[in-house]
Regions:
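Long, contiguous, secondary-structure-rich segments that constitute the structural scaffold
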Residues: 566-616, 708-710, 714-725, 729-814
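N-terminal export/assembly segments and adjacent metallocofactor-ligating motifs
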Residues: 2-309, 335, 460, 468, ...
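Long, well-ordered, tryptophan-enriched scaffold segments
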Residues: 262, 273-377
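Short beta-alpha connecting loops at secondary-structure transitions
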Residues: 282-288, 548-559
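A glycine-rich phosphate-binding loop feature that marks nucleotide/adenosyl-phosphate handling sites
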Residues: 168-169, 317-320, 374, 417-427, ...
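Phosphate/diphosphate-binding loops
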Residues: 507-508, 555-574
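Active-site phosphate/pyrophosphate-binding segments
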Residues: 333-334, 338-454
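Extended redox/cofactor-interaction regions of prokaryotic respiratory oxidoreductases
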Residues: 2-7, 182-270, 295, 405-522, ...
Length: 814
């Protein structure tokens, strides 16, 4: 029956101010950029027109994707079918209490993922070349037998180090269904029962910042909770865009807004793109060339040092290597940070605002003004998102940005921050144990294609192999569970295609997924997984400010088609591999959940009973300390609470990095340095390649997708079109108008997509939202707007991570 939309709904007016205000704050950010308003009104009207039946059930479920949030979904089910989706209805919008955990446009469209035409229906095996997407249907028994037989053969011939668990975050929030890190998955538990597997370290989101700030603070760098901004006088965000990357669930973007309303803190955004985090709520946007954040910081530091705006007492007491007083004896003369900034170090170049301006594109007078504001305003919440670190010089850039918080003594205090991304409170909920991996070898998550191509050549000193001096064998089998990094989310797709097409190299690829993704098309055996709506699990929060929560993700509907849960699949494989008892310990999936929940109640006594929690749907608890303050104990007593760095202090100069720089084998242009210096890295604005490819291409997390997840949902694609963002000045030079089809290209590939001509991009820079589904034609020209056709597989120097935002391209009108 056709639903008639009331004219009054379509005629309703929304003020520009009201629309902009709503955009990023409430997680409905799709409205602000090219979403036609009748779209949302029609959707609402259609939902309202759905009749309520007496047998309707409302069942708690969750969206468990890798967006930094985990959201409860209240599924309305009639006759075994999901009719519509609502979100959390417990609590209110006051972030001082147990507030609602509201799903965004993505989670609310979960029904369209469950019933998507792309759903995998039954097990299949490849019959064409890898990547062609040609498969034939097989039984589950045949699929299990093929996998078990071939895996045993490969282990016997090459050893367990030849079996690799690929990076996948499609169901990150689950307890039983968790897909990352690989060591915490049910596939890992299965492999650990069978002798282990080749592990990976790092991740595509934060490899460089995790490695870089490890040498500054020791371990993962913590940050203050966003709620603590209510104590701040100034907020400075480097490439941090919670308005899109943290727009739902724990609501980091809403914490930011409510906290600023209390503190009236000025907010300055430093980013090549004017993001939804701004959207009229920022006080200043400073556009900057990608990959030059460290140069900007150095220029700021020059002003702070020469105008006596640094916190000398803090630097003397808590830090190593700021000046001669705290420089390690092993360091060279004038090897300290102050000497480097003032031009008294080995390069002899003073890092003046004028010097920084030439590199960054930020005017020198603006650098001076910003330095004085940061140096004279305290406390200041200085943070960086994960955009600046996803570069060829990402590790060293993260250390540089953190220097602003260190120089001003904003670390370990209310209203301040460490210079890292915001932190949050978490609950000690128990997840599925996965046993110990007997294989100690690991590689960077970004270098698995190299491990297929030249595994035995990869060494610790040249390629970052950990656990041994070198790899002994290449990767011969890949498990790809709930991930699209086999193709779509991995850099330089055309190179990956060439490597994977040769099935004599990697002999077996098993893909477990819900949809026919780009990666699924490269499977040898393809297994259909259940969605979160088709099984029972617990979902845990991620970035959630100072209120943590757990969601009871109940089974909403029966598994569709022949889909099975990951626990069913791995249990059946364990049976064929002779390790069933060790793997299952005699428990079903629900029995494991009850077992884990009982353990969690011991750690969190406030949790209700299992059955009460099932009805309740969500458990929330606020941080008993109020706001989370990173390194507070260290600040209060550094001797009693040292950091995990070698010195126990904040290491501005890192002797460990000096040792690595002296011993590792690096390609020309790669730099590892004991100080947070500026180094351009490859394919920078200053690279000679700029003459051929004059535009810098950067990526961003688009609000309609979580990486590639939800990238096949029609209404989200219509609401938030995939476009290449380009400044009017660059567009005019090329005769490009808004909406024109353009070709973006370099030596690695070519993408055809529409142009979005907007002053929200810095001149000389273009941007593509990452995660769009790869859609090549016969000549391998991508028509889907997938940025990884253009990115490089050359890793960053220290973390060996993905430099996804370091790209030079040319753009032409088609």
């Amino acid at each position: 029956m056709k639903t008639k939309i009331p004219d009054a709904v379509l005629a309703a007016e929304v003020s520009r101010r009201g629309l902009v205000k709503t955009t990023a704050i409430g997680g409905l950010a799709m409205a602000s950029s090219a979403l036609t308003l009748p779209f949302s009104r029609i959707a609402h009207a259609v939902d309202s027109a759905i009749p309520t039946k007496s047998d309707e059930k409302v069942i708690w479920s969750a969206c468990t994707v890798n967006c930094g949030s985990r959201c409860p979904l209240r599924m309305h089910v009639v006759d075994g079918e999901i009719k519509y989706v609502e979100t959390d209805n417990t609590g209110d919008d006051n972030y001082d209490g147990l507030h609602q955990v509201r799903a965004c446009l993505r989670g609310r469209s979960m029904r369209r993922r469950v019933y998507n035409p792309d759903r995998l229906k039954y097990p299949m095996k490849r019959v064409g070349a890898r990547g062609e997407g040609k498969f034939e249907r097989i039984s589950w028994e045949e699929a299990y037998d093929i996998i078990a037989t071939n895996m045993q053969r490969l282990i016997k011939e090459y050893g367990n180090e030849s079996i690799y668990l690929n990076y996948g975050t499609g169901t990150l929030g689950g307890t039983m269904t968790r897909s990352w890190p690989p060591g915490n998955t049910l596939v890992a538990r299965l492999m650990n029962c069978c002798g282990g597997y080749l592990n990976h370290y790092g991740d595509y989101s934060s490899a460089q910042i995790a490695e870089g700030l490890n040498y500054t603070y020791g371990g993962w760098a913590d940050g203050n909770s966003p709620s603590d901004i209510e104590n701040s006088k100034l907020v400075v965000l480097f490439g941090n865009n919670p308005g899109e990357t943290r727009m739902s669930g724990g609501g980091v973007t809403y914490y930011l807004e409510q906290a600023r309303q209390k503190s009236n803190a000025r907010m300055i955004i430093i980013d090549p793109r004017y993001t939804d985090t701004g959207a009229g709520r920022e006080d200043e946007w400073i556009p900057i060339r990608p990959g030059t954040d460290a140069a900007l910081v150095n220029g700021l530091a020059y002003v702070m040092i020469t105008e006596n705006l640094v916190d000398q007492a803090f630097l003397d007491k808590y830090c190593v290597g700021y000046d001669e007083k705290t420089l390690p004896a092993s360091a060279p003369k004038n090897g300290h940070y102050k000497a480097y900034i003032l031009g008294e170090g080995p390069d002899g170049v003073a890092k003046t605002p004028e010097w920084a301006s030439q590199i960054t594109g930020v005017p020198a007078d603006k650098i001076i003004k910003l330095a004085r504001e940061i140096g004279s305003t305290k406390p200041a919440f200085i943070s960086q998102g994960w955009d600046p670190q996803r570069h060829a010089n990402g590790e060293i850039a993260t250390r540089a940005i953190s220097m602003l918080a260190i120089l001003t003594g904003n670390v370990g205090i209310n209203g301040g921050n460490s210079g890292a991304r915001e932190g949050s409170y978490s609950l000690p909920f128990v997840r599925m144990p996965t046993l110990e991996n007997p294989i100690q070898t690991s590689i960077s998550m970004f270098m698995w294609t190299d491990a297929i191509e030249r595994g035995p050549e990869m060494t610790a000193l040249r390629d970052g192999v950990r656990g041994k001096d070198k790899l002994d064998v290449p990767i011969k089998m890949i498990w790809n569970y709930a991930g699209n990094c086999l193709v779509n989310q991995h850099s330089e797709i055309n190179r990956t295609h060439e490597i994977l097409q040769d099935d004599k190299k990697c002999e077996l690829i098993v893909v477990i997924d819900c949809h026919m993704t780009s990666s699924a098309k490269y499977a040898d055996i393809l297994l259909p997984d259940c969605t979160a709506s088709e099984q029972m699990d617990f979902a845990l929060d991620a970035s959630c400010g100072n209120m943590s929560y757990v969601i009871f993700n109940d089974q909403v509907i029966k598994p569709r088609f022949e889909c099975k849960t990951i626990y069913e699949m791995t249990s059946e494989l364990a049976k064929r591999l002779g390790v069933e008892q060790q793997f299952t310990e005699g428990r079903t999936q629900e029995e494991w959940m009850r077992h884990l929940y009982a353990q969690s109640r011991e750690a969190i006594p406030e949790l209700p009973t299992f059955e009460e929690f099932r009805k309740q749907g969500i458990f929330k608890k606020r941080d008993p300390q109020g706001h989370h303050v990173a390194y507070k104990a260290f600040r209060e007593d550094p001797q009693a609470n040292p950091l995990t760095t070698p010195s126990g202090k904040i290491e501005i100069y890192s002797q460990a990095l000096a040792d690595i720089a002296a011993t590792w084998e690096l390609p020309e242009g790669d730099v590892i340095d004991p100080l947070p210096i500026y180094t351009p890295g490859f394919e920078s604005y200053q690279d000679p390649l700029n003459k051929q490819y004059p535009l810098q291409l950067t990526g961003f997390h688009y609000k309609s997708r979580v990486h590639s997840t939800y990238g096949n949902v029609d209404v989200l694609k219509a609401a938030c079109r995939q476009e290449m963002w380009i400044n009017p000045l660059d567009a005019q030079k090329r005769g490009i108008n808004n909406g024109d089809k353009v070709r973006i290209f370099n030596d690695r590939g070519e993408v055809h997509i529409e142009a979005k001509v907007t002053p929200r991009m810095m001149p000389g820079v273009v941007a593509l939202g990452e995660g769009a589904w790869y859609d090549p034609d016969a000549k391998r020209v991508d028509k889907g707007g997938c940025i990884n056709v253009l990115t490089t597989q050359r890793p960053s120097p220290l973390a060996k991570g993905n430099p996804s935002h370091t790209n030079l391209v040319q753009v032409e009108k088609v």
